[in-house]
Each structure stands twice: as C-alpha cells, then as structure tokens.
C-alpha cells in the first residue's frame, strides 16, 4: 500500500540531522512529560524520534490512501456558498473526518492540552506529505498552526479555552487582508471597539482573500485605536464562530487550490477577545504568525515539487517515442535531474530553517518557565537570527521551484500535460499561488536583503565551508569557494554604488545567489551523510549554481545607475 512518508526516504533522512538531538531535548524539556507520567510522552531521544516516525507514517498513509484519491473530485467540485456560509466539497469533508480520526490536529501543542508536542521540523514534514497529496487541503489542515500564535501570546485562560478544540480537529483561519490592504497590512481598517456593557470587543468591517474563511476559530487583525492609520493602531483578536456575527459574502473562483476556500467576510458587530496586548497586532503578533505561515508555504511547495517530479518521472519512464522511452533523451533527463536537484536542495533548506525555528522557539518557551543561562540566551539569540534570515529564502525559493517543477512536468508530458485528465496541469495551477500568498517572492527578497548586505548570510556560508564533506564531495566544495568570492564582490559592488534604486533593482539577483550557494552547501552535506540519496542531486545542483551565480554576478557588476532608465516603466 502506498505511503507518502515511507515511499520517500529523503524525508526520513532529515529526522537524523545532528541538530535533532539538541532540538528534541529542548522541545521535550529534558523529557519532563514522561517523568510526570503523561501518557505517550517519550522517555528519551530515541523514543521521541520513533514517535515522530509513527506520526509521519500515519500521515503518509492518510495522504496516499484518502487525500490523494479524493483530490481530483475536490478540484472539480470545490466549496460553495449557502446562506452566507461556506460549504466544503464533499470529499474535503471526508478528508477532514479521516485526518481527525488519525489524530492529526493540534500536533504542535503541549500534551497537557491534548496535543502531540511535535517540533516544527515534523509539522513541516506532515505539511509536505499532505501537500503532495492535495495542496488545497494542506491549506485547510495546516492553518491549525495559527494556534502556535495563540499559545505564544494568548492568556492561560484563552489557551485552555481554544487549544483543546484545535487538538480535537476544529479549523482555523488568519483574517488579515482587506480590499485596500493586501501586502500593506498597516492599512487594515476593520474596526474593533470595546463593548463596556458586555465586557468584550466588537468587530465591524470586511476581510478579503481569507483562506478557510468560515473556520471555527479566527485570528483577526483589526484597528483598536481610534484615529490611527498606521500599524501601531492594530491589535490581534480571537473570533469564535460559535458567537456569530461574521458572514461569508463571497467565495473566490481561483486558478488553482480549488479545495481551499478563499473568502470575503463581513464582520457585523462580531464578538471577539483581545489576544495579547493592544497595539502589537501587526508589529509583533502578525509577524510571528506570518513567519510560521511562510514556513508552511515552503513545506507546501516542497510537497508539490515532489509530486511534480513523480508525475514527470513516471510519464517519462512509460512514454515511448522514436522507438525508445523518452527518459533516454538528454532533453528529458536534463529536466528531470534539475527537478530532482531543486527538490532535494529546497527540502534541505526547508528543514534546516525548521530546525533553526525549533531551537529558537523551544528556548523561548523554556524562558517562560525559568531564567535561561547566559549560554542559553546566546543560543536563543543565534537561532532567532538564523530563523529570521532563513525563512524568507526557504519560502521564496521553494515557491519558485514548485512552479518550475510543475511547468517542467507538463513539458515532459507534452500535449498530454495540457489535458485536464492528467494531474500535472492541476499541480501547475496549484503551485502558481505559492509565490504570491503570505508575501510574494519580491517581499521575501525585501525581508532577506538586509542579511545579504550586513554579512549575515556570508558568515553562514563561510561557516558552512568549514564543515567536513566526503571525498566525493570535495571537488564540488572546491568549485563553490570561487563562487563565494564572486558573490562577495557582487554584494560589495551594490553596497558601494550607494544608490537605493540600484540596490532595490539588483536585490533579487543577490537573493538568488545567496540561496543557491547555501543550498549547494546543504545538499553537499546531505550527500556526505547519504550519498545513495543525494550524490547525483549535489552534482547537478552545484552545476546549476555555478551557471546562475556566474551569470548574475556578471550582470550585477556591470550594472550602473544609468541603466535604470531603460527599465523604468512610464
């Protein structure tokens, strides 16, 4: 029987990373749950890893044997609107029932609330697996991660009230964007007023492009401070569907991810609770929410990268032209090898980022219970910085790779790829949104570029160059060193130009170079530890990086302020 976890040993490989031992010890707080007699809590590192394998195996089984077989029906039917309520596609309802029965909700939450206490690494693996089966359903399922923000910033009373419901399988949404506030969230105008009589907040206004907008529990960004127009007037609220006051006005008809309802909502005096402190909704809470969501989109992207590669590979093996299978043609195996290299490198970046997030978040959680040692504080600061730096490249690069792999899968299918009966067209339609929502790739560049210019990425790269690799990888590593020198020169050229427009115009090329060098080093490390899985991809990806970094460095270092005139739109 198919299983989307056990069928792909490349996923399981990332459970064996050297950082996992420290990560699990912090996540389990030295296994205190087991010491306190909590059921199913691991007693040591090996027990924890075995728990993760079981959870991933269950996820892989449900993905392969329930969600994927339902995906075509969901894509064709989609959700619909009845009496201002969103109704899921019938097979989406079945997916929800089966994932609930399997216990796949509230998985990141502490066991005292009914959760499984899995780290981000494992949650990201689950997200990847479900996305490979159906990226639209992954949206609905993975929005449970909004509960992490409530856990982090909500009161103990709110935790006790809402977290067990998510662990039981209720759904969530994050209601941020509005008709006039898309990427520019400081323009949010949904109004929050305090009801003295009822001792609660009331929300009024419209939200647009809300994924899973008719969910059970919403986190809502709203303007709580009268007379303000910027981000400092915004707060975060919890809206419970049981209280009423929110209608679904419209469900968007989209290019892809048809099973995932994208809603326009009207808030009409809806009762809500303040989450955290006033005025910190955008500048603190939404930033945490968005970083988690961006990691989720990176995982969603890797799932589609994998499925697109699977579809292309299977078709190339069976399709014969000119007397032989098309997989024998250089033009085809060139595409397939690049697809696999992007997949393996992108997955490595995803899980390295998730590990950094886990290490930082676990130390932060421990700091709520006790004072951290000076060494732990330094460790938390280090991993916080790395998580912040790696998240935008993990999201941006993987979302682009998903579209590229889906595009190439269609190319391998030829005319059949353009026919609706083949899955590759759906993967292509689904993938297109990944580089748009939760911040376009251009916004990921904006988030990352300061780490390019302040030398953070360069130091990470130089540190990675010091790590030992296998004899087979040493020639590749030697080829990366001159690329790093070229990259450093390109960065310095842009900094020395001292022109903001030139800096912004060239930022994307510097971002791409950064990510490609980092992923080259990551995939070499993977190939050192598991050559049977990654050696081919390492060779292909380093060659791709050489080609791209050299071309982009040349472009950057031959660009001047005068060149901008040719590109400016009138």
Predicted feature descriptions by range:
Residues 2, 9-10, 19, 257, ...:
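Alpha-helix capping/hinge segments and adjacent helical runs
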Residues 318-342, 352:
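Terminal amphipathic helices with adjacent charged low-complexity linkers/tails
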